[in-house]
Amino acid sequence: MEQITKPHCGARLDRLPDCRWHSSMFAIVAFGLLVCWSNAVGGLILAQLKALGWTDNSTTATFSAITTAGMFLGALVGGIIGDKTGRRNAFILYEAIHIASMVVGAFSPNMDFLIACRFVMGVGLGALLVTLFAGFTEYMPGRNRGTWSSRVSFIGNWSYPLCSLIAMGLTPLISAEWNWRVQLLIPAILSLIATALAWRYFPESPRWLESRGRYQEAEKVMRSIEEGVIRQTGKPLPPVVIADDGKAPQAVPYSALLTGVLLKRVILGSCVLIAMNVVQYTLINWLPTIFMTQGINLKDSIVLNTMSMFGAPFGIFIAMLVMDKIPRKTMGVGLLILIAVLGYIYSLQTSMLLITLIGFFLITFVYMYVCYASAVYVPEIWPTEAKLRGSSLANAVGRISGIAAPYAVAVLLSSYGVTGVFILLGAVSIVVAIAIATIGIETKGVSVESLSIDAVANK
């Protein structure tokens, strides 16, 4: 029989001191993000396939667009399922879809079959990313939620230089025919380990259980967490400061995302993620091809790509240090302006040294923004009752731009060269910076429950 008393899981989670429990939740989510690098190897796989004669600019655009289309569907449907079934079940389900599609894709007999598998990879990955980034915010305290989320993004985005290093090591040892296949099998095996860890150690979100009115289950999970924290710290827990009104949770229908305060947040989140998708995935999927278009050979293009991609973890490390020190709106606007300016300067370079140096700093700022957008700001702006649905809808809308962008990049690269591509990226960045400045909300240091009360009350 369900208990009547509301467990106030949010306030109880927020009062917990940082300890090994937080670190274990962080480690599971971060490792899951680190090894799900099917998207990170996209550009490297395409470079190998181009050497094999499997692809040209048009096919590359299709490969990139179909990946984004899959991620669009995964993000859209994944949030609905995740809000219905819970964070833990969604985590495991989406990992299974992603792993299976990578294994099957690794044995593709031709490009058409690989593109079909790539779509399914995108579905699994799109749903998984929404679940991990948005769901993780429910486990962490509001006082340093941005820092914890940045740490997750920091570890997760080591996948880009890591898979580039693996590609560098594999290129002289394995033929191109087998190289790209191995690059898909490696993350599949590692993701299987992540799934096993989630199955064994990852609890359901007490906040989610409470939002569904499952008070007895929420209380059981919450007590288990609190008892573990007391054992780990050897100290009594601080008093609970109730942030909500104690009322029973309200159901938030999907239609609520299309009106009022929540619609404004959908528009805001979508804009933030449009900039992220267009800039990040253009660089991931096209940078090696851009280098080859400039006359740089395959080996050197992979080396340049690898050196540039080390800016990814460095950028997120910097973001981790400053995330809870700078207002969210200020940080988003500032990063987008820097990306627009530096991207244009980068497009004018011909020296290998300057390409490497400026490319490193460009990727640094891009991944500071990626951390800000995907791991912190967009996941923060939703009430628990609709967190995955809201985040997934914004992700889905944001990914529509990623479907069209590869074709625009292909045309611009062929007609106007590298500069044309980076003018497009700069224009998108400036438009979204204006959107954040005008309709953005401030979430730094604000509790999940405070955001929920405001949004649900005005839905």
Predicted regions and their residues:
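Transmembrane-helix signature of 12-pass secondary carriers
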Residues: 1-459
